[in-house]
Amino acid sequence: MFKIGIYGYGNLGRGVEAAVALNDDTELVGVFTRRDPATVKIRTSGVGVYHTDELEKFKDKIDVLIICGGSATDLPEMTPALAKHFNVIDSFDTHAKIPEHFENVDDAAKIGDNIALISCGWDPGLFSLARLYMNAVLPVGQDYTFWGRGVSQGHSDAIRRIKGVKDARQYTVPVASAVEAVRNGEDPVLSTREKHTRECYVVAEECADLAYIENEIKTMPNYFSDYDTAVHFISSEEMARDHAALPHGGSVIRSGKTGFDKENTHVCEFSLKLDSNPEFTGSVLVAYARAIKKMYDRGC
């Protein structure tokens, strides 16, 4: 039995809690929040909700702390700070900034002699492993990744941090013609813009500057600036009615060549279709938390 702490209790934190309940060898020690703990209700009976200020009291009671924050601003600060004191895992998904995040977390974990695993979800995460396997088998070829159609938690969180935004959902949508060309083994050369579009549904605060919000979204580096992005302003009622679910998915495809003249084409594909992005991501995090615990026990 290994003991898990959840740091942050939004959609992902709830997904981790649900995953812990389905794994017989895991125990939830506590949920830690920056909010007033009295306002946070969890599903696991007999488990406490604590303010993050109380976390240090649990240093010897938690085997792995699963950090459930946003990649835009939370995880770059949280994960290094917490890795000094706990074995930690996060799902940081800003691909362009992973090397920087790795260096910061690695330095912090070494200070506390802890193990830290970053960017562990399905992309980055399971999709990263799929690319590795496919490249090993087909060294001559081309990789393609398509996401969606589905809600990106990280991109939605990034929008919600813009001044004047009350709530937001961001859908990543693959360009159908591009997916078809890849699956047909045509090996197209595709720009970022040619592979996906982004659809944003935003609930603005009263009297917010809508033009400012739209511009901030469309020009946001690492998130939207390289894509054709549509921004739709809707009411809170429409958000609750039409965008409450959090589905997602996607495919990693490698089109490779074999033969002395590279005359044969092979298409390998690993795909996911998810009813709940946070619940699946939470399940991945719990699985890898188990590995962290085993590595730590072995002195790795």
Regions found by a protein language model. Give the residues of each.
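Short alpha-helices
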Residues: K110-N135, L285
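General beta-strand structural signal in soluble alpha/beta enzymes
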Residues: D90-S91, A116-C120, F146, R169-Q170
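C-terminal substrate-binding/catalytic lobe of Rossmann-fold NAD(P)-dependent oxidoreductases
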Residues: K3, R14-G15, L22-L28, F32-L55, ...
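Rossmann-fold NAD(P) dinucleotide-binding segment
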Residues: L55-V64, A72-S91
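Rossmann-fold NAD(P)-binding glycine/threonine-rich loop
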Residues: F92-A116
